[in-house]
């Protein structure tokens, strides 16, 4: 039907007769001469037709998004008529034959216009996908999947599918449940990850497994979350953390070659505690400086009882400083007010600061600090004339969070972030357990191997867990797993999953661990998030062919939707009103 894609045609084809096919991107009638920009997956080429052509009458019928097959002769555009914005901007095709394969209703959205309301774009997603940008995104997505398969296969990994219909083990996010017609009153769950099955594959001697896995989580949505998503999932036997990290680094190095980036290995490693204390985040963006500085000891003798009491409780509370170079000339009073309102959203009671001016140090904190305290702050933060030092004080968790967010906000405001940089980081030595209202739960998941399980302070127990971070975004992570039944039971006990409940939920895993499970570990990388970062897309929805909205619905198909009474009866379900 066609001899060339649109952008395959160039000056070397001048004089040749070729056939192209695609959609009418734009249509123009200039004094009887018809110009059509034809679009296919590769890009655009201009078709031209005057009244002397036998295709002229057909060309007059063409409108936006009509499906066309065109035959014609390639010629150079006239002097001064070239379009440098197009790859084919120096040539055009003089129409000899034109077939309208299909007509189109007037499109409700302009193809490729990102300013169109997103809900409308998602409702007509099949039109939205016609944009050249969308094609490039999914072309890259396909390439990355192929690179992943080839790279891991070369390292001895087997691609193995794990079940989609699985057992509900509600830990963390809610499961999507599927009622069983055969087993009345019982349900399957869609997998939140292949975690337990890939561990069982290691017990089964598969040694190295991977899949590009579909996962499902019924959780509140954010800009970078979807109820169904894809991850690069892998597991290895007889390995330690360094082995797993090495595989991930090799894989990411190969993947980023696809967009022309050379990334160096090994990636920097940072303990979780250092990341939180210095950057207020377990996924710090290191494309810019601005570390948080601990200055609690500078407030020990403060005349403000609130600050001095916080300084005397370093286990549970923090006083953190953020020195912003040159900010005194850049931040007006209104900007300072905006920053205060910003941190209040995250639990701050206010935002104290010191302005380092030529005629002295100004700010509401000055009167509460001794001369020694002020001197120590300047030394610790490296503050000079023209700088502003911001302070956060109070509960450790709250302060680290809002000061970390302030760090990012300031960097964005002052344009300190190199948008073209790629800064990879491993965050390691995560806490094994986190405190909740009802005791403790596993910070990653309860199948992670702890480092020091006998530690008297449960909050000091660390995990053999690791996250890979790119530019402040968690790409993925993993851990070394528990491979002995006794240790698995011990971890369950720590998070109040006692024997009976453990057997009910995870009895099949505990049974498997009795039969010589090898040491093993693995990782998962968020595939959608990876593609979002590689393409610099604004939303994860841009890199998924048919995404859900932030209300977990599909505007294209109107899913989820009600089902009829007969279907409900077959599934032994009665709805309560």
UniProtKB/Swiss-Prot annotation:
Instruction: Look up the EC number in the record and give it.
Output: 6.1.1.23
Where does the protein end up? Cytoplasm
Q: Does the keyword Protein biosynthesis apply?
A: yes
- The entry marks the following residues as binding L-aspartate, namely 171, 217, 444, 481
For the region Aspartate, give the residue spans. Answer: 195-198
One GO cellular component term, please give it: cytoplasm
Q: Which UniProt keywords apply?
A: Aminoacyl-tRNA synthetase, ATP-binding, Cytoplasm, Ligase, Nucleotide-binding, Protein biosynthesis
Listed under catalytic activity are: tRNA(Asx) + L-aspartate + ATP = L-aspartyl-tRNA(Asx) + AMP + diphosphate
Q: Which Pfam families match?
A: GAD, tRNA-synt_2, tRNA_anti-codon
User: Which amino acid positions bind ATP, per UniProt?
Assistant: 217-219, 226, 474, 526-529
Question: Assembly and partners?
Answer: Homodimer.
What is the name attached to this protein's record? Aspartate--tRNA(Asp/Asn) ligase
Organism this protein belongs to: Helicobacter pylori (strain P12)
């Amino acid at each position: 039907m066609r001899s060339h894609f649109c952008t395959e045609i160039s000056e070397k084809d001048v004089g040749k007769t070729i056939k192209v096919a695609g959609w009418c991107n734009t249509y123009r009638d200039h004094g009887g001469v018809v110009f059509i920009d034809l679009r296919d997956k590769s890009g655009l080429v201009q078709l031209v037709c005057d009244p002397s052509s036998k295709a002229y009458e057909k060309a007059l019928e063409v409108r936006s998004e009509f499906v066309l097959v065109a035959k014609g002769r390639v010629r150079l555009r006239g002097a001064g008529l070239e379009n440098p914005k197009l790859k084919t901007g120096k040539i055009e095709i003089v129409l000899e034959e034109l077939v309208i394969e299909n007509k189109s209703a007037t499109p409700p959205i302009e193809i490729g216009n990102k300013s169109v309301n997103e809900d409308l774009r998602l409702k007509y997603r099949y039109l939205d996908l016609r944009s050249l940008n969308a094609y490039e995104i999914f072309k890259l997505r396909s390439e990355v999947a192929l690179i992943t398969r080839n790279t891991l296969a070369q390292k001895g990994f087997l691609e193995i599918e794990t079940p989609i219909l699985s057992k509900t083990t509600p830990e963390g996010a809610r499961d999507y449940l599927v009622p069983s017609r055969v087993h009345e009153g019982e349900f399957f769950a869609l997998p939140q990850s292949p975690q337990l099955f890939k561990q069982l594959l290691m017990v089964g001697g598969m040694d190295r497994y991977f899949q590009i896995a579909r996962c499902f989580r019924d959780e509140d949505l954010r800009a970078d979350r979807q109820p169904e998503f894809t991850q690069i999932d892998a597991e290895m036997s007889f390995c330690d953390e360094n082995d797993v990290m090495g595989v991930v680094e090799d894989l990411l190095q190969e993947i980023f070659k696809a967009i022309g980036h050379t990334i160096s290995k090994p990636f920097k490693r940072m303990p979780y505690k250092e990341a939180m204390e210095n950057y207020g985040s377990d996924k710090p963006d290191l494309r810019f400086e601005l570390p948080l500085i601990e200055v609690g000891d500078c407030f020990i003798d403060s005349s403000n009882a609130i600050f001095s009491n916080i300084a005397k409780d370093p286990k549970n509370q923090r006083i953190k400083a953020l020195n912003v170079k040159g900010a005194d000339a850049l931040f007006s009073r209104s900007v300072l007010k905006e920053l205060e309102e910003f941190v209040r959203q995250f639990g701050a009671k206010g935002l104290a600061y010191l302005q380092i001016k030529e005629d002295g140090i100004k700010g509401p904190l000055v009167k509460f600090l001794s001369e020694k305290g002020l001197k120590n702050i300047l030394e610790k933060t490296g503050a000079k004339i023209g700088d502003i030092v911001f302070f956060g004080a109070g509960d450790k968790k709250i302060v680290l969070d809002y000061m970390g967010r302030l760090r990012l906000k300031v960097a964005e405001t002052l344009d300190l972030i190199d948008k073209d940089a790629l800064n990879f980081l491993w965050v390691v030595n995560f806490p094994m357990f986190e405190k909740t209202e009802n005791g403790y739960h596993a910070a990653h998941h309860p199948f992670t191997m702890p480092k020091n399980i006998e530690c008297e302070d449960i909050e000091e127990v660390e995990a053999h867990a690791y996250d890979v971070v790119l530019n402040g975004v968690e790409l993925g992570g993993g851990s070394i797993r528990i491979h002995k039944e006794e240790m698995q039971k011990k971890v369950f006990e720590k998070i109040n999953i006692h024997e009976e409940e453990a057997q009910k939920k995870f009895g099949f895993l505990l049974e498997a661990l009795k039969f010589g499970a090898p040491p093993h570990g693995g990782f998962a990388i968020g595939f959608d998030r990876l593609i979002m970062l590689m393409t610099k897309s604004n939303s994860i929805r841009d890199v998924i062919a048919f995404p859900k909205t932030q209300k977990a619905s599909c505007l294209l198909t109107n899913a989820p939707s009600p089902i009829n009474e007969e279907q409900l009866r077959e599934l032994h379900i009665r709805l309560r009103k």
